């Protein structure tokens, strides 16, 4: 099993911790309610959020273009990320609700116990080898959030973690 830039413990992702703190009086239901009203997270909101988390990239983009004007590979990577961000889909209603409530607010993913109706998936019981990747430059899945898998997948015969030098989108 492989996980690339996957936040396995959302307590290490600042924007989610802020959301939890702000909605604590409603036990997280304020965000769940908004997700239901909007049918999930609309694509323009997802796109704006991804760009906002990498605001430094946006500010530095003109200098990056000038610095790499003679490097077609660097410019192609930048354009690929821009195209990806411009076409990002939204998150559908039920999926976004489950992710918010179970993964983020209640921390099920971090504990390794996912609830799907009457079923419980115990991630700590996975025995297959696992390869994880994380980056200190990832604004979406902070390095500690991705590295959490080293402790989480304790039933695996082998868990390897590799730190890469890249943003969440490459």
Ranges and model annotations:
Residues 139-145:
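Conserved alpha/beta-hydrolase "acid-adjacent" motif
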Residues 104-122:
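Active-site nucleophile elbow and catalytic-triad environment of alpha/beta-hydrolase enzymes
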Residues 146, 151-169:
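Catalytic histidine neighborhood in serine/cysteine hydrolases
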Residues 1-94:
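Alpha/beta-hydrolase-fold enzymes
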Residues 126, 132-134, 138:
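Short beta-strand/loop motif that positions the catalytic acidic residue
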Residues 75-82, 128, 163-166:
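Short acidic (Asp/Glu) and glycine-rich catalytic loops that position anionic groups and cofactors
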């Amino acid at each position: 099993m492989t996980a690339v830039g996957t936040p396995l413990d959302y307590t290490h992702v600042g924007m989610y911790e802020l959301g939890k703190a702000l909605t604590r009086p409603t036990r997280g239901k304020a965000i769940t309610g908004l997700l239901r009203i909007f049918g999930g997270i609309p694509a323009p909101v997802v796109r704006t959020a991804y760009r906002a988390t990498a605001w430094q990239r946006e500010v530095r983009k003109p200098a990056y273009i000038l610095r790499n004007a003679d490097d077609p590979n660097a410019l192609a990577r930048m354009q690929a990320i821009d195209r990806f961000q411009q076409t990002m889909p939204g998150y559908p209603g039920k999926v976004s609700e489950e992710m918010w409530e179970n993964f983020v607010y209640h921390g099920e993913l971090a504990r390794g116990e996912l609830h799907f109706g009457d079923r419980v998936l115990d991630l700590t019981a996975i025995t297959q080898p696992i390869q994880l990747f994380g980056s200190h430059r990832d604004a979406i899945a902070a390095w500690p959030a991705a590295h959490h898998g080293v402790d989480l997948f304790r039933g695996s015969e082998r868990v390897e973690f590799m730190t890469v030098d890249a943003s969440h989108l490459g």
